[in-house]
Amino acid sequence: MLGFLSRLGLWASGLILILGFLKLLRLLLRRQRLARAMDSFPGPPTHWLFGHALEIQKTGSLDKVVTWTQQFPYAHPLWVGQFIGFLNIYEPDYAKAVYSRGDPKAPDVYDFFLQWIGKGLLVLDGPKWFQHRKLLTPGFHYDVLKPYVAIFADSTRIMLEKWEKKACEGKSFDIFSDVGHMALDTLMKCTFGKGDSGLNHRDSSYYVAVSELTLLMQQRIDSFQYHNDFIYWLTPHGRRFLRACRAAHDHTDRVIRQRKAALQDEKEREKIQNRRHLDFLDILLDVRGESGVQLSDTDLRAEVDTFMFEGHDTTTSGISWFLYCMALYPEHQQRCREEVREILGDQDSFQWEDLAKMTYLTMCMKECFRLYPPVPQVYRQLSKPVSFVDGRSLPAGSLISLHIYALHRNSDVWPDPEVFDPLRFSPENSSGRHPYAFIPFSAGPRNCIGQQFAMNEMKVVTALCLLRFEFSVDPLRLPIKLPQLVLRSKNGIHLYLKPLGPKAEK
């Protein structure tokens, strides 16, 4: 018996060694293929083991990439470790060559999302992506978005009441966390029809789960030892991720079941149809393909989870960095405030039509997105070869990183790129600009389907903030840019808030 077990152990050890060797061989062949594909693109020197990972994980890494754009025009290889290599692009014609096509997302990055958000619009490709995109597009029509203005305002006012108390202490405080709570509450109301009216999420298992999943997913992407699924699910970090995933899925599944049951009841269905607005789940349950088939429960959950994931973090980043820019440039802050006051006049609240009138605020917001794009990088895998404007090319299977932050600060595209100048986005200055020079919501057929929703929310939130408070920076706690799934700050965004009095906000 002992001899049999000993032989079995030897066989198992041998099998593990063989599998490990085959895995290593596969990785080496992949590296060789990627390196050969990018042979015509010079780039910064790499570490023998970590590639460029040590450089891009340092504080100030975003601005390091910007300096590389001056050394290596158009694009350069970017190695994350020895086996994952992207062509990092930051020039409009290069961006157009890839992102005008609709290639799938790079699995080396986006496969980490699957356990939580499933195969929703973010990670789907091919005919099913096209089908879902077509089905979901009516959900972002302006007739659907109009009633959301009141929801945006309600959640914002709750946050502003909290800020009123904090501002009275006379200290600067980090706004990022509060904006995140408000954005998630807003999204829950727009998705499920209800949120947390007090923005106090300690008892909300769904809020805790979504917040934790976002953090854990970023930590996994940043940690090489967690990239292997088998190893990751055995770690405490992986088990924590699975628990949070289960909590989020249980909540979404429960709401879907309840809503489906309500739609079977004639009276309940009539109540839903007579509400002030349809939420995102209502719309998903109502859509049908050309054959009349509805989305499956699996597809429903994937699209809801995708909407929650994409919707709250990006707007949190956009709003927080915009308020920082307003604090940094008080003359633009005041001009935006005056514009909003003039638009509101004697009204008690914003109307849908008011949003289009916020022209200067919109220009300031776009300039903020140029300098601080909510999503600093997006990734693709080429489904077919691509040829670039300078004659260089890449084969199918190559990985692409579009570095939006570097593109938006490329001095060949933007004169004086570090200067905050909202007039870059005036109609006369925008006319004739390359369509891929400014792409805060990505670009092409796979651009952000919810960009109008996000812009509307950010306009309402920031306008109400500017009416209630005057913002100024804390010179001792300036934000340190941290590129993750969205653009964050390593030390938060600390601002001083000065209440403008009860008559400032209508």
UniProtKB/Swiss-Prot annotation:
Reaction catalyzed: an organic molecule + reduced [NADPH--hemoprotein reductase] + O2 = an alcohol + oxidized [NADPH--hemoprotein reductase] + H2O + H(+)
Reported cofactor(s): heme
Keywords from the UniProt entry: Endoplasmic reticulum, Heme, Iron, Membrane, Metal-binding, Microsome, Monooxygenase, Oxidoreductase, Phosphoprotein
GO CC terms, sorted: endoplasmic reticulum membrane
Cited InterPro entries: Cyt_P450, Cyt_P450_CS, Cyt_P450_E_grp-I, Cyt_P450_sf, Cytochrome_P450_Monoox
Cross-referenced Pfam families: p450
Residues found modified as Phosphoserine: 431
Protein biosynthesis as UniProt keyword: no
Subcellular location: Endoplasmic reticulum membrane; Microsome membrane
EC top class named in words: oxidoreductase
Record flagged with keyword Iron: yes
Induction entry: P450 can be induced to high levels in liver and other tissues by various foreign compounds, including drugs, pesticides, and carcinogens.
Molecular function GO labels: heme binding; iron ion binding; oxidoreductase activity, acting on paired donors, with incorporation or reduction of molecular oxygen, reduced flavin or flavoprotein as one donor, and incorporation of one atom of oxygen
EC assignment: 1.14.14.1
Membrane topology: Peripheral membrane protein
Chief place of localization: endoplasmic reticulum
Gene3D superfamilies: Cytochrome P450
Binding-site positions, heme: 310, 448
Protein family membership: Belongs to the cytochrome P450 family.
PANTHER family: CYTOCHROME P450 4B1, CYTOCHROME P450 FAMILY 4
Function: Cytochromes P450 are a group of heme-thiolate monooxygenases. In liver microsomes, this enzyme is involved in an NADPH-dependent electron transport pathway. It oxidizes a variety of structurally unrelated compounds, including steroids, fatty acids, and xenobiotics.
This protein's name: Cytochrome P450 4B1
